């Protein structure tokens, strides 16, 4: 009962504070109409934020009150001596105990599934913000993504920055960037921004800005992404000139040897792939690409572009829609996702534990990337992924960060110094470094 009483007291207190705050807000709005100077406008903004914060807290307390009342009802409900719930259809008790009640009132099955997003609406929404707030939000959801998601799970957060504002009747108000942080039970609307969709759309729209500021997701850093993107134009040019094992050109008698050599190159295979992609466009994604081309975005139009690999710097969970019709781009993202799985498998293999515990440490980035990308309307070309792996797989594995990069000789020397010093100052057994 004390919990319910405490929550009710908090609700009453916040309602009183909200009444006062709303009255102060009305006073400030009237003052702005009479004396529209900066000081009074700033006061108005501060009072708007206070009212918004109090409304959020009050809504949270009311949710907690509803949950507490629901729990209390469940606790006081008389138990059936047979152990069977009154509305259970079983005639005899199951061997399983009763678990949680899953409330599905909030789920709308008419909405598209989580794999489907309205990329045009999402893209137009994001492009409507200033670059600083977009990149800062990207940093919070990629470089510091795990912490941000953990702290805000199950809520709809708002990013705020001084560069993002809108003028309404001469009053400068913050223009918040909204991102939903879903739980496993959440159903997302087609136009709703989630961390995965946000990283996907921003990486596809602003790779040059990401490259200049070196914004990178930790999961990309540990697979050696920094090494991979170094000298990218030269790297991809050399790759394109190499012989492709999947091409067997039909050579007519008298064809010059130089032309025959050219027809066997990876470049020709990529040209063929581009022809296939050009025939499989989706109208909404074409609209997004056209809209982005008229503004600030810097989406790559060729895999040889210097900023092309930076589309994947923040580990989007699928190929960004703005470059999905560029030959080799979606497959490059799949290559990175395989590298993430390879590194996690290596890390799981070197840890101590049972086979089951090791399996839990493995990941399925590739399967997730494949499923999400193909739901956007294209099939990935597995041969291109294989070409990437043959060309760069070995050197990328050699540049994995495996958390134990200390030289064996250095480790041995450091351990001997530790052992010696511990023996000098105590009779305890020295720990291993």
Swiss-Prot record:
Region entry Viral RNA-binding: which residue ranges?
175-217
Q: Which residue ranges does the record annotate as region Interaction with host DAXX?
A: 377-433
Q: Where is this region: Chaperone activity?
A: 1-100
- EC number(s) on file: 3.1.-.-
User: Which residues constitute the signal peptide according to the record?
Assistant: none
Please state which protein family the record places this protein in.
Belongs to the hantavirus nucleocapsid protein family.
UniProt comment concerning the protein's domains: The N-terminus is required for chaperone activity and, in trimeric form, this region likely serves in high affinity vRNA panhandle recognition. The N-terminus also contains a coiled coil region, which probably participates in but is insufficient to initiate N trimerization. The YxxL motif is indispensable for the interaction with host MAP1LC3B. The central region is involved in specific RNA-binding. Has distinct cap- and RNA-binding sites so it can bind simultaneously both the vRNA and mRNA cap.
- Name-wise, this protein is Nucleoprotein
The gene name on file is N
